């Protein structure tokens, strides 16, 4: 796949998953590291998320579990929590996934992830009311 096609595929995938949230990250990177924004579109979204072996819901579940377990990626976790809602995960599913992380990543890590989810759920609720 050509770089242009990778970028176009990645951008379309990002918009499908995350709408404006991911695009804002890329735009912010234009000021400091435009190439990194390009890589962020091409590799994860153009190459990996666009693969046929797993649907977007499954990919986002894996992503929020990994980001929660890392324990140091709160902004990215919040973006992917929103994306998880966008691709069909319920709040209950998300909560259960994050609670599961207590077993493997510890209670503080799971607690922090649950607090991030609470913020995302509240923001999503406010946006729904505004429509």
Go through the PLM ranges and name each one.
Residues 66-73, 106:
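Short alpha-helix boundary/capping elements
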Residues 13, 44, 79-80, 96-97:
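A general alpha-helix detector
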Residues 58-67, 97-98:
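Short, structured motif recognition centered on aromatic/hydrophobic residues
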Residues 83, 99-102:
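Hydrophobic alpha-helical segments of small multi-pass membrane proteins
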Residues 1-57, 111-131:
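Acidic, glycine/proline-rich low-complexity segments that act as flexible tails and inter-domain linkers
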Residues 102-108:
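C-terminal structural segments of small proteins and small subunits
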Residues 73-95, 109-120:
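Extended intrinsically disordered, low-complexity coil regions enriched in Ser, Thr, Gly, Ala
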Residues 32-44, 72, 76-79, 85-86:
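Acidic-glycine-rich active-site phosphate/pyrophosphate-binding loop
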């Amino acid at each position: 796949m050509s770089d242009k096609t990778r970028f176009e595929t990645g951008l379309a995938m990002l918009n499908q998953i995350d709408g404006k949230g991911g695009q804002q990250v890329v735009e912010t990177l234009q000021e400091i590291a435009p190439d990194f924004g390009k890589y962020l579109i091409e590799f994860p979204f153009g190459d990996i998320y666009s693969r046929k072996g797993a649907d977007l819901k499954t990919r986002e579940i894996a992503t929020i579990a990994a980001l929660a377990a890392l324990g140091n990626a709160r902004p990215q976790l919040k973006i992917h929590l929103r994306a998880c809602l966008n691709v069909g995960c319920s709040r209950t599913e998300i909560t259960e996934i994050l609670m599961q992380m207590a077993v493997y990543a510890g209670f503080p890590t799971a607690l922090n992830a649950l607090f991030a989810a609470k913020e995302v759920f509240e923001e999503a609720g406010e946006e729904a009311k505004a429509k």
